[in-house]
Amino acid sequence: MSVKSSIIKDFSEQYSAALKMTEDVIVKCKEELWQDYNHKEVISQLVYHILASADYSLCKTNNERDSFNRKYGESGFSFHDPNKNFSKNQLTDYLEEIKEKADNLFNNLHSQLEKEDKFLALP
């Protein structure tokens, strides 16, 4: 495995670990805290912010980044918008979309590097 392939593999594993930690927050957070507006930040809105940022980070080109639209809009980015509620199911579905997008991106990068490695290994 080349150094580049190893870096992509490590980055993929770390990205997956970060998504797993986010999933743990969604699954393990008690319902009474999930939409609790008595604190500085609302957990469901904070998780949405994390997911939208993760989704944005998977954009492959500047054009994709420039035209990026957050799945559920901007209002969840205030962290304390009583009009914006995100259910656990809603954010779990979004997380699954991001996982699939990340898997596709990292698999494509790995495949491209394998082809490059094979080409460079030719006599």
What are these regions (language model features)?
Residues 19-22:
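Conserved PLP-dependent catalytic core of the aminotransferase class-I/II
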Residues 34-43, 120-123:
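A glycine-rich, coil/turn loop motif that links secondary-structure elements
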Residues 1-10, 53-122:
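Short, helix-capping/interhelical loops that line the mouth of catalytic, cofactor-
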Residues 49:
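Histidine-centered divalent metal-coordination motifs
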